[in-house]
Amino acid sequence: MKFQIDKTDGNARACTITTAHSVIKTPIFMPVGTVGAVKSLDALDLKEILDAKIILANTYHMFLRPGSKIVKEFGGLHGFTKFDRSFLTDSGGFQAFSLRTNTKNDDDGIHFKSHIDGSLHYFTPTSVLDTQYDFGSDIMMILDDLVALPADPKRVKLSIERTIKWAKKAINYHLQKRESGVGLNQNIFGIIQGGTDENARKFCAQSLCELPFDGLAIGGLSVGETNREMYDTVEAVMPYIDSARPRYLMGVGTPEDIVENVERGVDMFDCVMPTRNARNGTLFTSFGKINIKSARFIHDDTPIDPCCDCYTCKNYSRGYLNHLYRAREITFYRLASLHNLHYYLHLVSDIRTAILEGKFLEFKKDFYSKRS
């Protein structure tokens, strides 16, 4: 993987990440394809309509079904899904945490029960990498010890101790595998934990920056803290994250979260929000969100957002989308998801343009003024 910083504007950065499968201009938002597909969309939608350069797939779900060996038989995620651009795969630790299916963490990994059939499994720092080697993902995330917020200080301390221990195991294992010819085009990111404790975050960040990870992620946020706590935590930890590597804020978030955290130096984002909200009838626009299922749109022949040039806005009206939603027509999910993801991808593209032009603060002011 190649990484270069193209321009900075304050702490905001416009960078370029080059993997074996695509060139990724940052800031970037990664659509979430939990089970190898972004819900209601296929690879052609992602490539030809949205022009997505990278998407995320979930190790927990793909490990349980269909299984990493089956994915490998098809040539990894790229061959299996026919999305031939970049994939980032998470470690599965967050799903084991969030689904709470008899999950138990110990010093060596995470025990969990499958939400599908109740079978018992154990994720370790090395086993999740073996799974991701089978997937052939371009960016692999290490296993980390995640805690819900607010958290007891003793639990936060244990979390960062385990996360650092697991990070060392993971990077050493990855370097050994590369020497044997495995994972040569695969990159590995460390994950910084520490809750909202600034000293814990600082210690974890400094410890992980000593290791030769290709990039660094901030994990364990958007799990119960306030927006202000999130922003303050990111701002506090950022000076201790190596600026020469990509910075990824995991599982975040709203358009406002993206703008605020780009300002603090984050390069990469992912979240299920645009597709989940789309399926529930909430659509993002340049002037805020609208609820397309509202009766006030029944006779509305205008597009979702007059300023949007997405496939849905160029071809269909609010009234038609309102009808599709009320009729529970599956076509609605595709059209709404295309719009919301287009909004997110163009938001980060517009932010990048503003950074390159040295106008990020002007962009931010305009962004919020349209929502007031």
UniProtKB/Swiss-Prot annotation:
Substrate binds at D90, S91, G92, G93, F94, D144, Q193, G220. Coiled coil: none annotated. Zn(2+) binds at C308, C310, C313, H339. Its EC number is 2.4.2.29. GO terms for molecular function: metal ion binding; tRNA-guanosine(34) queuine transglycosylase activity. The active site is at D90, D270. GO terms for cellular component: cytosol. Residues 251-257, 275-279 are annotated as: RNA binding. Keywords: Glycosyltransferase, Metal-binding, Queuosine biosynthesis, Transferase, tRNA processing, Zinc. Pathway: tRNA modification; tRNA-queuosine biosynthesis. One of its GO terms (biological process) is tRNA-guanine transglycosylation. InterPro entries: ArchSynthase1/Queuine_TRR, TGT, TGT-like_sf, tRNA_ribo_trans-like. Pfam families: TGT. Binds 1 zinc ion per subunit. It catalyses: 7-aminomethyl-7-carbaguanine + guanosine(34) in tRNA = 7-aminomethyl-7-carbaguanosine(34) in tRNA + guanine. Its cofactor is Zn(2+). It is an enzyme of class 2 (transferase). NCBIfam families: Q_tRNA_tgt, tgt_general. Belongs to the queuine tRNA-ribosyltransferase family. Catalyzes the base-exchange of a guanine (G) residue with the queuine precursor 7-aminomethyl-7-deazaguanine (PreQ1) at position 34 (anticodon wobble position) in tRNAs with GU(N) anticodons (tRNA-Asp, -Asn, -His and -Tyr). Catalysis occurs through a double-displacement mechanism. The nucleophile active site attacks the C1' of nucleotide 34 to detach the guanine base from the RNA, forming a covalent enzyme-RNA intermediate. The proton acceptor active site deprotonates the incoming PreQ1, allowing a nucleophilic attack on the C1' of the ribose to form the product. Homodimer. Within each dimer, one monomer is responsible for RNA recognition and catalysis, while the other monomer binds to the replacement base PreQ1. This is Queuine tRNA-ribosyltransferase. It comes from Campylobacter hominis (strain ATCC BAA-381 / DSM 21671 / CCUG 45161 / LMG 19568 / NCTC 13146 / CH001A). The gene is tgt.
